[in-house]
Amino acid sequence: YFSKAVLAALPYMEFVPDIIQCNDWQTGLIPVFLKTMYGSDEFYRNIKTVFAVHNMKFQGRWKINEVVDITGLPHHIFNSNELESYGEANYLKGGIVYADAVSTVSPSYAHDITTPEGGEGLHGLMEARKDVLHGILNGLDYAEYNPADDKYIKFHFDKNDISNKRKNKEYLQKATGLTVDDNALLIGIVSRMTDQKGFDLVAYVIDEILETMDV
C-alpha cells in the first residue's frame, strides 16, 4: 500500500519528481507500479527510479496469488523474467527488474552480488543488469564521527596520539563486566552477527589468535 500511495499522492501534491529513490524490498513495487500501472499517464511519464539494494538476503517473498489480489498487478508479470522467483513473488527482484538504475553499498558488493556466493539466488539477474548497477561506497561524515571530539567516545584520541585507546579498552571491559586486562584481545562492534558483516573473517583467524594470544 505504501508503494502505491507514494505514486498516487504525487498529483495531489502537484509534485513531479525527476527521480524516486527506492530502498530495498519494502519499496520494490514502486518501480513496478510506475511502469505497469502509472507509466501511461503523462504526469508520470518522465519520472525515473533508482533502486538501492543494501542486503540481497532480504527479498520480500510472498505467495503470488496473494500479491496479485492485494496489489492489483497483472498476473502475467509474475514470471521468471520479472517478479517471480522460485515460485514466489519477489519484491526485491521486482525493484531490480523495473528500476532505471540499481545501486548498492560499495563497488565490491556490486561485484559480489553478481556471483552465486553473493547473489542470494538472484546473481543471474544482477549479472544481466550490471550495465545499470552501481556500487556507491558507504562513508562517514568525518566532522561528526571524529574520535578527537566524538561525544560518544569516552576518551578522545587522534592519529597523532592514540594512547587514550587503552583507556577506552579498559572502560569497555569494565562496562561489560570483563576482566580488565591490557593484553587481552578485545573487539567491540555494533552489528548483526552475520557473515555479511565480516564475522566470517574473525572465525577464519580465531584458531591462530587462540594459539598466539592470551584470550
List where the protein language model places each region.
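Catalytic cores of nucleotide-sugar-dependent glycosyltransferases that transfer UDP/GDP/TDP-activated
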Residues: 1-215
